[in-house]
Amino acid sequence: MSKRKKNKTNYSKSIFRIASLVILTCLVYLIFGGNIGPIKFQGYLPQIKKHFSKGKNAVTSKQQSGSGLYLYDGTAIPEYSKEQIITLNNDKPFFTVDEINSLVNSHYFTYGGQDMYGRATSAIATVSKDDLVASETRKGIELPNPKGWVGRSKGGIYDRSHLIAYTLGGKNDLDNLVTGTISFNQKYMTQVEGDVRDYIKSSGHSVLYRVTPYYRGDELVPIGVLMEASDGSSFIRNRFVYNVQDGFTIDYKTGEVKEN
């Protein structure tokens, strides 16, 4: 091959590579709208994207079903206004079809683990009658301190609060504990926990149960928790419990409290 032909061939290949690179760059720009970076799903789950929208204080948390990371910021949840527990989505939980179907052929307790700040992120379980535990059996068990815990001496308003209650088979470690007020834990979370426990006892059916804490940004104490339950049929719950205590102001970033 002559030197001229060889140079012409190399020149054609170079033009082809440049053209390909330009086309690829244009495609990427069109797909991502010029905002190339980490891709995060918007919403508590992709199937219910419409329920949650992006906010300034969004936090990435591990979604417990193994489907990756989801961005949720609770903007569909109204600001706390006297009602410490509210019903969402007409009490219909946000479970996927696959999650509901897991009631039929599997039994599990799955925890989302702790995020980069050491906070518990989520817990989901198929709770059966065999998982129910009498509360008396927990006496003497020492619980670790979750993030934001400042002890009972500073205001005396906190409990080490289980995501999945001990009486429903939940474990006693930091994957399943958050700092919650006594009112939040003992008065309002127990309402949903009691409903689940009573239904399982009376019906003998298993219940799909999920509790997800909501944090603002890097705050250590959750603003509240989303509690969902379903037997796959008539028994359903979808409640949000606010982590507040009458007469006190909470610094959710540190856990410090001040009496009003």
Question: Residues of each region from the PLM?
Answer:
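N-terminal Lys/Arg-rich, disordered targeting/topogenic segments
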Residues: M1-S14
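Hydrophobic membrane-insertion alpha-helices, especially the h-region
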Residues: R17-G33
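Alpha-helical protein-protein interaction elements
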Residues: L21-L24, Y44, K62-Q64, Y72, ...
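Domain-level detector of nuclease and nuclease-like folds
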Residues: V97-D98, S102-N260
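N-terminal, intrinsically disordered, polar/charged segments of Gram-positive cell-envelope systems
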Residues: I36-I100, H107
